[in-house]
């Protein structure tokens, strides 16, 4: 099985390190990867938000499993992109949908979600430059 890991941080290195130990893994690709991932995977150059490039890489390298580490491509909808494309929909992708990614990508969305479902969290309120005086009072 060929695996693609998106990202360049410590999280992605840890994922690659773990999956490199599996006998089910034929080849690992990292986009863009880092110096540590280079020892375990083939680093590829490219932008983690260039979904068309990631599609080409996935098809060319017969990717079966795809991990997404960074928040940015998740919030930008990489899971939804893969699942809506007939050529990519059968690739297993480890990432939340764009909507679910908002829990990590938007603190305002996450706080509203927690309040709506009675999940314990610190008090919050959203402010803008127009209501800065309210922000001072809130604090």
Feature map (PLM): residue ranges:
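ATP-binding N-terminal substructure of ATP-dependent carboxylate-amine bond-forming enzymes
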Residues: 1-99
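Active-site nucleotide/adenylate-binding loops and adjacent lid/helix of ATP-dependent enzymes
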Residues: 4-5, 103-139
């Amino acid at each position: 099985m060929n695996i693609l890991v998106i990202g360049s941080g410590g999280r992605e290195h840890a994922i690659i390190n773990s999956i490199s130990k599996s006998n089910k893994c034929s080849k690992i690709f990292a986009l863009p990867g880092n110096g540590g991932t280079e020892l375990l995977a083939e680093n590829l150059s490219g932008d983690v938000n260039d979904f068309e490039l990631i599609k080409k890489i996935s098809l060319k390298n017969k990717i079966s499993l795809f991990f997404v580490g960074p928040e940015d491509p998740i919030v930008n909808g990489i899971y939804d992109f893969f699942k809506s494309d007939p050529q990519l929909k059968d690739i297993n992708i480890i990432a939340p949908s764009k909507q679910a990614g908002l829990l990590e990508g938007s603190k305002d969305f996450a706080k509203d979600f927690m309040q709506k479902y009675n999940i314990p969290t610190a008090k919050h309120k959203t402010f803008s430059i127009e209501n800065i005086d309210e922000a001072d009072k809130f604090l």
